[in-house]
């Protein structure tokens, strides 16, 4: 009588690594407990965050903007619930767009980027932070530096003897430039008859009771820490 063949034991096939977790594995259960505890702690910290009006933690600071470049004003704030941010320049609201960019670098840091710097960007910038519990604000200045230049030089002039001659140049620059005038390469020595004035955007040379000796080549020059410029004009008195 032949004996029956012994029954074969089922062969366990291990799942591919990373595909299946055995929830009965003590290590898996321990890891799950730690994850849940960490998540509950995170929720608790978030829920315990104090609600209230916004506060400025690190104020804005004055910055220097070079013509043609960009500048950034940065402020660190504390606010919960999340606030509404508004930036303004000299009291006028600035819209987020190509020229002015609202930047949120992390939950507590906000910034304003001013692009394509020009002299018109000089001024006081303010941030206003508002949430349902209140508001706070802060301000700083953007100081603009522009290489000096002569926007429009003086015109060549013909005058009659005894009349008054004026030569005017339109100038630009920040910091405000040093300005000078020369005649035939020599610095002009001012007196009550020949003198020049310097305004915020113009400089004017005045020659009273002009004589033929006042004829010549006149030069105006401007210079600041970022550059210099010059322009010429011819005066003929007869």
From Swiss-Prot:
SMART domains: IG, IGc2, IQ. Keywords: Immunoglobulin domain, Repeat. The keyword Endoplasmic reticulum does not apply. CDD domains: IQCD (cd23767). The keyword Lyase does not apply. SUPFAM superfamilies: Immunoglobulin. Pfam families: I-set, IQ. Residues 29-55 form the IQ domain. GO terms for molecular function: protein kinase activity. Residues 54-143, 147-236 form the Ig-like domain. This is SPEG neighbor protein. It comes from Homo sapiens. The gene is SPEGNB.
